Amino acid sequence: MAKVAVVDVEQELSQAVEDVFAPFGGVSQVLAGRKRAFVKVNAIDCRPETYTSPAVLDAVLKVLRKYGVEDLNVMENCTQGNFTRMVFAATDLGRVCRRNKAKIIYLDEQPVAEMELPGLGERVRFPRLIIEEFGGQEREAFYLNVPRLKAHSMSVVTLGTKNQLGLMDQLDRMKNHNFNLHARLAAIAQIFRPDFTLIDGVKAVFYGHYPPASVVDRCTETLNVLVGGKDMLAVDTVGARILGYSVEEVPHLALAREQGWGCGRLEEIEVIGDLSRFTKKYPYHLLPEFPEDVKIIKGGERCCPEGCELNTKAVLQFLYLDHQGKGGFTILMGKGFDREQLKALRGPVLLAGKCATQEALPIIQNNCSKIYTSAECNDLASTIKALTKLMKVNPLKLVPVSPIRSLVLLALAKLHGSRARVGI
């Protein structure tokens, strides 16, 4: 029977982290003598509450040091439209790593190699370092997955399994980030198995995984809980339960369970700790607040919430709420449009996604004053670039550092080989 520890954070975080490992024989037994460790955080962006808590990361690194880890590495590949070096520089994550003498591995700056996603016949790129360290059965290093406890507008929840999407190269992430997303997440879980997954539930994030800073208090709640175990699917099953969801409501977890990549039945998991205080169902959908003068036309045949629809709406929302972005344009997303409606379109238009671009561009290209395209299912960098122009928002103001420092950091990232797709 899989075991999952649920620890209330009532004392020092370092002690709470140790308490998560305790039911598995303690940190020393889980490490099994390994002196090198890689910690995969969730650091998609530098906006408030979008990343693993620096306090939790600090506690994790201190505990690993205490139990003999000598070569300590923290790794991430942030979301598109940004670059990982920026996220660590603009948040306390970078300072925590330096204080604990942990090396930061910016995965977008690493050389890549191709692997096939099992069962999908799709070849995608991962950092060669990740493939060499964790792509086989035998490993010398300890792999700790530390996601943030979040609901997610495109995947219902984002926990350990979803956190591993950050291992994939950004250029491949934007493709098939549609109805295929859940199958891709389950396939990645088959390739890369963390030795231990520890969910940071100090604060839960909901109404999507990317809350606008101006309304972040409406999108977070302090829970003061850590959840951990060796079986990532079992840990995610318990994490989903804390957020109010069953595995059946989370397609990628249901797929992983069906394919046998862990225990995904709550009744078959030995939960060490108390779940009774978690009684809410935290909404995963976005807040219903968008500029009234932006017209969104969805195709009648298909419009994937996992791709062109909710990625675009999330950017639209935070530019509107946080940066007072202007409207006065149309967004087309999905496929299966009314041809006459397309012919009647005027003014500026954003074609969001591959389907809308392929279907609508030939029809509207001679009628609309300005056309922007985001030509993959989740071409977030192009979406940000287009929407900042349409909404008259300076993209250099999207990060909490000066424009000069932003450009210096970007130059450093490019110098080190960054493949990140930046939205400027």
Map each language-model feature to its residues.
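N-terminal and secondary-structure boundary signal
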Residues: 1-424
